[in-house]
């Protein structure tokens, strides 16, 4: 019951200035081309090396969640472009520094 309540309880408003910006490198599945292939090519199939950049909104033992977009309207409290990556797939998390452009 506590787990269910946690899932349906609205999340507190997120302070985006306290959420780290990151670049994450992870391994992902790679689909092989269709048709007949030499067995050695199938056995040696590489994994895809992927990267994502965004806000690191979840970082625990099971997964990380990256959110690319954030609505700055305080009444909206929505994010977009998110991806959940199993923790075991993650190879590297690089923390990025946010700098503001000057005119």
Model-derived features with residue positions:
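Conserved RNA-binding domains used in RNP assembly and mRNA/RNA metabolism
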Residues: 10-103
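N-terminal amphipathic/basic-hydrophobic helices that include classical n-h-c signal peptides
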Residues: 1-10
């Amino acid at each position: 019951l506590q787990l269910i309540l946690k899932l349906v309880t609205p999340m507190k408003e997120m302070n985006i200035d306290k959420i780290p910006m990151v670049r994450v490198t992870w391994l992902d599945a790679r689909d092989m081309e269709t048709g007949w292939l030499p067995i050695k090519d199938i056995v040696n199939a590489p994994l895809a090396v992927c990267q994502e950049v965004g806000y690191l909104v979840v970082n625990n033992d099971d997964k990380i969640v990256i959110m690319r977009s954030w609505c700055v309207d305080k009444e909206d409290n929505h994010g977009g472009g998110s991806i959940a990556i199993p923790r075991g797939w993650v190879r590297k998390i690089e923390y990025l520094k946010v700098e503001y452009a000057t005119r």
